[in-house]
Amino acid sequence: MEYQGIIFDFNGTLFFDNDKHVKAWNEISKILRGKEITLEELHTKLNGTPNIQNILYFTDGKATKEEQEKYSQKKEEYYRQFCKEDTKSFHLVDGVCEFFDYLKEKGIPFTIASASIKENIDFFIESFGLDRWIKPEDIIYDDGTYENKIAMFHKAADVIGVDMKDIRIYEDSNSGIRN
């Protein structure tokens, strides 16, 4: 089948960063519970779940809305800090730049649909120069209005002007695929 457009997930697909998320959640867990997360918690409670849900888990459901927002933002600040500190692996996956260049050269429309928040998307645009290939306003991110990742993919398809049946999606998360 010929694909006429492409949608990429970002984290875990174009940029390998899971270790930074784990470190950031460890910091939040230490603040809220006085201990780090366990591997079991990571795999059964935290991976692929929204920040707010994780914060409620750490606080036994007792975090106020203000605390949820505060610690969600704090987690992402830690995450960005850990990304910047790891200069060896703070880059797009090998071959991505060349593939993006190829897609641009061939006129194949593409964009990113990520569960990341706007602050992280802005960070990625600036750090990786994503605006060389994709207009920042065409990147779909978690602004709180999408029911699930599939809804984000549909919005991304609208943005690039290609019917979903003609799009190839690169997604690494089972939760992103199952939705």
What are these regions (language model features)?
Residues 1-3, 107, 164-166:
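A general structural motif
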Residues 8, 170-171:
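Active-site flanking residues adjacent to catalytic metal/cofactor-binding acidic residues
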Residues 97, 101, 177-178:
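Alpha-helical segments flanking ligand/cofactor-binding loops in enzyme cores
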Residues 3-94, 102, 106:
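N-terminal helical cap/lid subdomain that shapes the substrate entry/recognition surface
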Residues 25, 55, 96, 121-125, ...:
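Hydrophobic packing residues within well-ordered alpha-helices of enzyme cores
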Residues 89, 111, 117-168, 174-178:
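Substrate-recognition "cap/lid" segment bordering the active-site pocket of phosphatases
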Residues 21-22, 48, 52, 97, ...:
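Alpha-helix N-cap/helix-start and coil->helix boundary motif
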